C-alpha cells in the first residue's frame, strides 16, 4: 500500500520512538487518523508544549520545566552525596528508593563505537559539579551493562585521589539490566549495599 506524503511523514516521525518499527508506526498513524483524531491533536499539543517548555536543570542536568529541578531546589537534601546516573529515567528510579542526596545526569554512557566519549556524555561537567560542590561521596549508579560498567570505571579512575568516597551500586540490580526497569525495593537494596571502588 502506498501512503500519501503526510501519512508517510507521520509514520516516519513515529518511528523515532524506541521500539517502534515500521508496522507499529503504521498502525499508530492509521489509528490516530481513523479512530482518534482528538487524541492525535492532544498528543501533538502535548508534544509541542513539552518540546518548548522542558529543558535541563542547570545543576544536575535532568529534565525540568524550571531552571532547577525539584531535587536540586530542595534545601533539605543531603549535599554530601552525589549520585551519578545515565539519564533522567534513572533519577526517577533512584527517587523511588528514598535516596535524599543530589544527582548528576550523564547523557548516556561511554560508547566509543557510537562516537560517545567523555565529553559527549558530560564528564567535564561532572568534574565541575564535583569541584564546585561539597560532596564527600559519589555513588556511581550507571546501568550494570558493559557500557555502564566501563563508564563507572572511567569515572572512578578520574576521581581517584580527590578525597572522595567512591561507591558503586551493588547486588540486587541484574547484570545487563536497566535501572529504569528495576523495582524500587530491589534498587533500594542495591543502594543500601553499595560498595567502595578501589
Swiss-Prot record:
Top-rank taxon, per record: Bacteria
Gene3D superfamilies in the record: 3.40.1360.10, 6.10.250.240, RecR Domain 1 (1.10.8.420)
SUPFAM superfamilies: Recombination protein RecR
ZnF (C4-type) ranges: 57-72
GO molecular function, one term: DNA binding
One GO process term, biological-process aspect: recombinational repair
Record domain Toprim: where: 80-174
Pfam families cross-referenced by the UniProt entry: RecR_C, RecR_HhH, RecR_ZnF, Toprim_4
Keywords: DNA damage, DNA recombination, DNA repair, Metal-binding, Zinc, Zinc-finger
UniProt cross-references to HAMAP family, sorted A to Z: RecR
Family: Belongs to the RecR family.
Function noted in UniProt: May play a role in DNA repair. It seems to be involved in an RecBC-independent recombinational process of DNA repair. It may act with RecF and RecO.
Protein's recorded name: Recombination protein RecR
Amino acid at each position: 500500500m502506498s501512503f500519501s506524503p503526510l501519512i508517510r511523514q507521520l509514520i516516519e516521525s513515529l518511528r523515532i520512538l524506541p521500539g517502534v518499527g515500521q508496522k507499529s508506526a503504521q498502525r499508530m498513524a492509521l489509528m490516530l487518523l481513523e479512530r482518534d483524531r482528538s487524541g492525535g491533536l492532544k498528543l501533538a499539543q502535548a508534544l509541542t508544549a513539552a518540546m518548548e517548555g522542558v529543558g535541563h536543570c542547570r545543576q544536575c542536568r535532568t529534565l525540568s520545566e524550571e531552571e532547577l529541578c525539584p531535587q536540586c531546589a530542595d534545601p533539605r537534601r543531603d549535599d554530601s552525596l552525589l549520585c551519578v546516573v545515565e539519564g533522567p529515567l534513572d533519577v526517577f528510579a533512584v527517587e523511588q528508593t528514598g535516596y535524599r542526596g543530589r544527582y548528576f545526569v550523564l547523557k548516556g554512557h561511554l560508547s566509543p563505537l557510537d562516537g560517545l566519549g567523555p565529553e559527549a556524555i558530560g564528564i567535564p561537567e561532572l568534574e565541575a559539579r564535583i569541584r564546585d560542590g561539597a560532596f564527600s561521596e559519589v555513588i556511581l549508579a550507571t546501568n550494570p551493562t558493559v557500557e555502564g560498567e566501563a563508564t563507572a570505571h572511567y569515572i572512578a579512575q578520574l576521581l581517584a585521589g580527590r578525597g572522595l568516597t567512591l561507591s558503586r551500586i551493588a547486588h540486587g540490580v541484574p547484570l545487563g539490566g536497566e535501572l529504569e526497569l528495576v523495582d524500587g525495593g530491589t534498587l533500594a537494596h542495591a543502594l543500601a549495599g553499595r560498595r567502595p571502588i578501589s
